[in-house]
Amino acid sequence: MGQVLVDYHVHGIGHRTNKHTAPELAKYIEQGIAQNLTEIGFADHDEYLLELDFSSFLYLQRRYPQIRLRLGLEVDYRPGQEKILGQRLAPYQFDYLIGSIHFIGDWPFDHPAYTAGYAAWDIDELHQTYFSLVTQMVRSGQFDIVGHLDLIKVFGYRPRRSVLDLAGSTLSAIQESGMTVEINTAGWYKPVAEVYPGRDLLEECFRLGIPITLSSDAHAAQDVGRDIARAREMAWAVGYRQVAVFEKRQRSLLPL
């Protein structure tokens, strides 16, 4: 098997900027083919669940046999909502679920319009709170992939303590759960200018035997596959030789 390049975090609907229709999704797929991807995973935000057009997706799988297409969902994890989430997703068959933390309480900490909220926190306590939420998400057992593991750094507010110390119990929980961590290239285009997770966390993931997949977090067709080859090189340099892919919630590991 030749080089495997996957992009498992693609938002076909974006932030409701696109329609989940065959013509719109085809633009993403054709960009992926142009980027030499072997597999694309569409994973829109769960708030758009009712807007997903499953028939269009099945049609596109037939139309583009040269690339594997997978259908996932990125879910905003909220503590205490696990039962409701399970009931909500029960009627659907996804290939994988990404669990992500975008809110601390009601604060959307990664939204540029709400950066003033950082002033209310001690930066170490903020990181500790964030990673505690990631740990709860992991231990819920509802997800396959940890989305942008260290998203809390998005605006460049770095903790005083070692991030390995702050995230240590989270990484242990991920290891115990058998979940996969994505290397999400969107961080290179945020104020922090660093991939998620950073190199130190990725090295610890490798040491713990945590599998990885590759993701652009594209919200527009032109961003599909963006820096996926660069992320692959980073994973290879750390020591990874396999990449995780999913079908019907079952993980396989392919040569990286």
Q: Model-derived features: where do they sit?
A:
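Domain-core and long-helix interface of multi-subunit machines
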Residues: H15, E51, I101-L208
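Generic structural signal for residues in well-ordered beta-strands
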Residues: L69-L71, V181, V243
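Residue-level detector of anion-binding/catalytic polar loops
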Residues: T38-E39, T180, P211, R241
